């Protein structure tokens, strides 16, 4: 996606000491950046606040990262908002999250419209409370004709469930004679995932220092570069994003082949 140079320079002006924004190669920005937004609860607990306050603070960080990615010309930003396992959290926390999802989508619609952001959901949103689901569906309709960056929000998402769902759909089509089992390949499986039509993430960012995938995009991250920061999600900002992209740009992406040095 093309970036607006004036808006880019303005948004990333006055970089803090130690942040090398001028070193960023704007011709090598990942097309798809994915964020595992972790640490909201611990951020709140460390400040003597209720865990739900961390989720509220995390929304502000997501807003900043959305804007930063638009400014950088990122094609797709995906974010892990609520997993299929998160239903096991205390009911009060789940209720607050569902309310926050609905309220945030309404509150952020002006931003999404102003920045021409298209929204898609990864996961089974039919299982969400009716009020939250209705807000999501209305928001999707209002953003449907947007042609800028795609924001893919993983809500009630689990990668194993996603892959199982895809396999089941393919099996049903094969049993009905709609497809030849011999024709089943990577592309066919990918076309049955929630991310169908989206490029795989080149860069996956996980906050809070945890070194695990947490059942997230297991198929799609086969060749992704990972960046882990100890920063909790509510403290992750545009400058943290710049650091992550700089780290990505310093990697030698081999896709199972030889490095550039080895090829030489």
Task: Give the positions of each predicted feature.
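Flexible, compositionally biased loop and terminal segments
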Residues: 1-264
